[in-house]
């Protein structure tokens, strides 16, 4: 008897195990989003911890995590570093696996305040979920100035970290500006004026006077930096608006064009004349007069300094940090003054000879300025188009540098030319992928002629209009990698097209994931994408024919033959 019971148990277990072997190949093997990414939260006064327990074989996208407070003020969230994941269509993305804990600092929360948390993830098998949104109720939190002060600093540091260069770059830019054709030829003249025409000053005295002149110039720039940083605190939000970013991009493009010599930007000549006369009235050779000379010189913007100075001012305005604003422009002025100090002490023998190379330095700064519009527009047009703009800028710069280097006669410049040419070829790759990829995509999209639907009513109407023909509904989204793989590799296959020749093809694009999209997914009981549904001539779905996850052309063709009603 015991042997029979044991045999019966083995039969039952083996039946459950082997039943999976006969499941439909397109049947969903994926868990709901709440199981794939188990979300939880815990609040303790100002401290809130958001946690995700991520199922093995699934991952969350770092850039898709968004937190929006309602009737509450929070510090900018500091997302931890993830691991890199790469796919064919979106390149490298940071993702989280296993477990994610995100601490959030609540500065103030009124009664009934909430936090809206949005996140999105995928499975390694090529199945992506629509963005998930959770509402976190917050306990009332009274604003604490002492607690919020460090948060303000961290926010400023975060804004600064996102900027294209650090404050120390201002020193290098200042040194570089000193070697432009508008500035370098003036240094011997300025040196003579600063020393008051006295030829027998000691080295220490000459160095002291020049240093005082540079400090006067730095004072003007530092004050300008403080003013712009203070204004930036009020207009940081405006600096993130798309229209403002586009406007600034246009302005800096024009400034770059001025560095290329298309036109000249400087103070009105009448104002420059007045400032120059004021400077000339000061007594050279005396510390007080030299300091005033430097302060006035800081107000006279030459055509070569206008564009770089404007770029640094934008950097300061974005940071909103008073110390950073003053310090950055102080370093900029110090960089411009270092060559002057060297010339004053050691004479003109350290001064390079004037020539076409100075115009080339000016042009190179034009390309540096052009990087700012790309940096600004990248926030508006997205990473893909941003990469293409960086590629175009790289091709233009390295191409110009290569052509310019051809004028050199020295043998070692041949190595530099090879490096520049190689850099230009590497830079053009994203543009090449875009050009060939766009053509290929356009061709692929014409292979299957989908009728677009949006709502449940439109789906029902399309099923009625099918008039007895079988219907295939493809659920697609731009954020679904496997959906794009279906478009590129599966739907373009002639065998697949032939198998679908007598089928009405519908497609719902749920990229926006709005209320209508959510209602459609709920109506169809769809967990995520890609999902392809098949309906018979009476408009009834065949659940066994449903496809979830990517299938190549051969597998999908076999599925159509075996499963399509």
UniProtKB/Swiss-Prot annotation:
The chain crosses the membrane at residues 163-183, 208-228, 243-263, 296-316, 323-343, 357-377, 384-404. Keywords: Cell inner membrane, Cell membrane, Cytochrome c-type biogenesis, Disulfide bond, Electron transport, Membrane, NAD, Oxidoreductase, Redox-active center, Signal, Transmembrane, Transmembrane helix, Transport. GO terms for molecular function: electron transfer activity; protein-disulfide reductase [NAD(P)H] activity. The lineage of its organism: Bacteria, Pseudomonadati, Pseudomonadota, Gammaproteobacteria, Enterobacterales. It comes from Shigella boydii serotype 4 (strain Sb227). The keyword Transport applies. Disulfide bonds join 122-128, 182-304, 480-483. Pfam families: DsbD_N, DsbD_TM, Thioredoxin_2. Residues 434-565 form the Thioredoxin domain. This is Thiol:disulfide interchange protein DsbD. It is found in: Cell inner membrane. It is a multi-pass membrane protein. One of its GO terms (cellular component) is plasma membrane. InterPro entries: Cyt_c_assmbl_TM_dom, DsbD_gamma, DsbDN, DsbDN_sf, Thiol_diS_interchange_DbsD, Thioredoxin-like_fold, Thioredoxin-like_sf, Thioredoxin_CS. Residues 1-19 form the signal peptide. PANTHER family: THIOL:DISULFIDE INTERCHANGE PROTEIN DSBD. It catalyses: [protein]-dithiol + NAD(+) = [protein]-disulfide + NADH + H(+); [protein]-dithiol + NADP(+) = [protein]-disulfide + NADPH + H(+). Required to facilitate the formation of correct disulfide bonds in some periplasmic proteins and for the assembly of the periplasmic c-type cytochromes. Acts by transferring electrons from cytoplasmic thioredoxin to the periplasm. This transfer involves a cascade of disulfide bond formation and reduction steps. It comes from the Bacteria. It is an enzyme of class 1 (oxidoreductase). GO terms for biological process: cell redox homeostasis; cytochrome complex assembly. Belongs to the thioredoxin family. DsbD subfamily. Its EC number is 1.8.1.8.
């Amino acid at each position: 008897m015991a042997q029979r019971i044991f045999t019966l148990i083995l039969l039952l277990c083996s039946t459950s195990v082997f039943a999976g072997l006969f499941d439909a190949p397109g049947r969903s093997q994926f868990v709901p989003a709440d199981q794939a990414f188990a979300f939880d939260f815990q609040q303790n006064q100002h401290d809130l911890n958001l946690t995700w327990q991520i199922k093995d074989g699934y991952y969350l996208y770092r850039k898709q995590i968004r937190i929006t407070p309602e009737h509450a003020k929070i510090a900018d969230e500091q997302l931890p570093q993830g691991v890199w994941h790469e796919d064919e269509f979106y390149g490298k993305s940071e993702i989280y696996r296993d477990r994610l804990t995100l601490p959030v600092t609540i500065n103030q929360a009124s009664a009934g305040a909430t936090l809206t948390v949005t996140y999105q993830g995928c499975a390694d098998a090529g199945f992506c979920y629509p963005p998930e949104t959770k509402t976190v109720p917050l306990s009332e939190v009274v604003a604490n100035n002492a607690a919020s002060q460090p948060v303000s600093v961290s926010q400023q540091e975060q804004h600064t970290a996102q900027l294209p260069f650090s404050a120390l770059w201002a020193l290098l830019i200042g040194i570089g500006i000193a070697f432009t054709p508008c500035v370098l030829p003036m240094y011997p003249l300025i040196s003579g004026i600063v020393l008051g025409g006295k030829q027998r000053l000691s080295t220490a005295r000459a160095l002291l006077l020049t240093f005082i002149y540079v400090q006067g110039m730095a004072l003007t720039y530092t004050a300008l930096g403080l003013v712009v940083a203070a204004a930036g605190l009020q207009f940081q939000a405006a600096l993130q608006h798309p229209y403002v970013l586009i406007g600034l991009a246009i302005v800096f493009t024009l400034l770059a064009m001025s560095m290329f010599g298309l036109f000249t930007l400087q103070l009105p000549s009448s104002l420059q004349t007045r400032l120059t006369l004021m400077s000339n009235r000061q007594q050279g050779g005396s510390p007080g007069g030299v300091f005033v000379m430097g302060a006035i010189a800081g107000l006279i913007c030459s055509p070569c300094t206008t564009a770089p100075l404007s770029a640094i001012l934008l950097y300061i305005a974005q940071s909103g940090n008073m110390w950073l604003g003053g310090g950055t422009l102080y370093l900029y002025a110090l960089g411009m003054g270092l060559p002057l100090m060297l010339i004053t002490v050691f004479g003109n023998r350290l001064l390079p000879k004037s020539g076409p190379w100075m115009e080339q330095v000016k042009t190179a700064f034009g390309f540096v300025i052009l990087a700012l519009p790309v940096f600004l527009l990248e926030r508006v047009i997205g990473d893909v188009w941003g990469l293409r703009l960086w590629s175009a800028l790289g091709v233009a710069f390295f191409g110009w540098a290569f052509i310019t280097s051809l004028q050199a006669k020295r043998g070692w410049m041949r190595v530099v030319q090879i490096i520049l040419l190689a850099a230009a070829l590497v830079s053009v790759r994203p543009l090449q992928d875009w050009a060939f990829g766009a053509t290929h995509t356009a061709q692929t999209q014409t292979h299957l002629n989908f009728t677009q639907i949006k709502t449940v009513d439109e789906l029902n109407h399309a099923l009625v209009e099918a008039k007895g023909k079988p219907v295939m509904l493809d659920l697609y989204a731009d954020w679904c990698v496997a959906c794009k793989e279906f478009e590129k590799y599966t739907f373009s296959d002639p065998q697949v097209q032939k198998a679908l020749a007598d089928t009405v093809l519908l497609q719902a694009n749920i990229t926006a994931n709005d209320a209508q999209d959510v209602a459609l997914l709920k109506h169809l009981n769809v967990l995520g994408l890609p999902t392809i549904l098949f309906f018979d001539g009476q408009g009834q779905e065949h659940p066994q024919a449903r496809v979830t996850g990517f299938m190549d052309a051969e597998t999908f063709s076999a599925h159509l033959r075996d499963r399509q009603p």
